[in-house]
């Protein structure tokens, strides 16, 4: 986010939490999407169906969340992953939520949405950011909801061994306009600064009394 004004105001912390990966189910096949003699219409129908499937997945994810509030699965966030190796892609729900936000903002036909893609128009974000998976070994400590500093455990015990905790963090890029101010802000009238903001996610931690448990901790989630 871009903080604009002088003096600067503190950014409030937003809470969030969601399931790690709900089951994905799709229906239909290519034959149901287009006729054998109409390839052009088939491709258009396929694109529209893909958009419809994504929106259904988002709705299904919300239902799954509400039905599993008291289960262990609710302990995981879309930005937290338990894995034996470094994840190769961003969290699935993270991508779906980003796509949903884009569709809601566009509120137009699929064809217009594709042509209005910011990448096609050469638009640039106000603040540049970078996202990557980090381990508990890199984080070591974090601040929980009570303001206490807790130790982030690197490994989580599971029935067949142990898995590592990975966190998908987003922060302001050290290059570009991060130090010079927000892009597009008139420096003659405003002081601006790109700042990394945080949100809460659930993670396995240990407090200063050696008590281990799942707690909400703050991690970098946006710029």
UniProtKB/Swiss-Prot annotation:
Q: Does the keyword Secreted apply?
A: yes
Main localisation, per the record? secreted
Signal peptide start and end residues:
1-5
* Compartments where located: Secreted
Q: Which GO terms describe its cellular component?
A: axon; dendrite; extracellular space; synaptic vesicle
Return the InterPro entries for the record: Brain-der_neurotrophic_factor, Cystine-knot_cytokine, Nerve_growth_factor-like, Nerve_growth_factor-rel, Nerve_growth_factor_CS
Instruction: Name a Pfam family for this protein.
Output: NGF
Checking SUPFAM superfamilies in the record gives: Cystine-knot cytokines
Sorted alphabetically, which keywords does the UniProt record give?
Answer: Cleavage on pair of basic residues, Disulfide bond, Glycoprotein, Growth factor, Secreted, Signal
> Which one GO biological process term can you cite for this protein?
nerve development
One annotated GO molecular function: nerve growth factor receptor binding
Q: List cystine links.
A: 127-194, 172-223
Glycosylated residues are: 107
- Coiled-coil spans in chain: none
* Residue ranges the record assigns to the propeptide: 6-114
Protein task? Promotes the survival of neuronal populations that are all located either in the central nervous system or directly connected to it.
Task: Say which family it is in.
Answer: Belongs to the NGF-beta family.
PANTHER family, per this entry? BRAIN-DERIVED NEUROTROPHIC FACTOR (PTHR11589:SF3), NERVE GROWTH FACTOR NGF -RELATED (PTHR11589)
Q: What is this protein called?
A: Neurotrophic factor BDNF precursor form
Gene that codes for this? BDNF
């Amino acid at each position: 986010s871009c903080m604009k004004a002088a003096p600067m105001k503190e950014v409030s912390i937003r809470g969030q939490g969601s399931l790690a990966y709900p089951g994905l189910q799709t229906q239909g096949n290519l034959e149901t999407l287009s006729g054998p003699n109409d390839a052009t219409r088939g491709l258009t129908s396929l694109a529209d169906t893909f958009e419809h499937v994504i929106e259904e997945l988002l709705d299904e994810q919300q239902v799954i969340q509400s039905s599993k509030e008291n289960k262990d699965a609710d302990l995981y966030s879309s930005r937290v992953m338990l894995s034996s190796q470094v994840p190769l892609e961003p969290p699935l729900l993270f991508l779906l939520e980003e796509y949903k936000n884009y569709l809601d903002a566009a509120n137009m036909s699929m064809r217009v949405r594709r042509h209005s893609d910011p990448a096609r128009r050469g638009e640039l974000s106000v603040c540049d950011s970078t996202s990557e998976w980090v381990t508990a070994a890199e984080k070591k400590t974090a601040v929980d909801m009570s303001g206490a500093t807790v130790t982030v455990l690197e490994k989580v015990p599971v029935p067949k061994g142990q898995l590592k905790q990975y966190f998908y963090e987003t922060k302001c890029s050290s290059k570009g306009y991060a130090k010079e101010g927000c892009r597009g802000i008139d420096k003659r009238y405003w002081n601006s600064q790109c700042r990394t903001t945080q949100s809460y996610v659930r993670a396995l931690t240990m407090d200063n009394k050696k008590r281990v448990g799942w707690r909400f901790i703050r991690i970098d989630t946006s710029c």
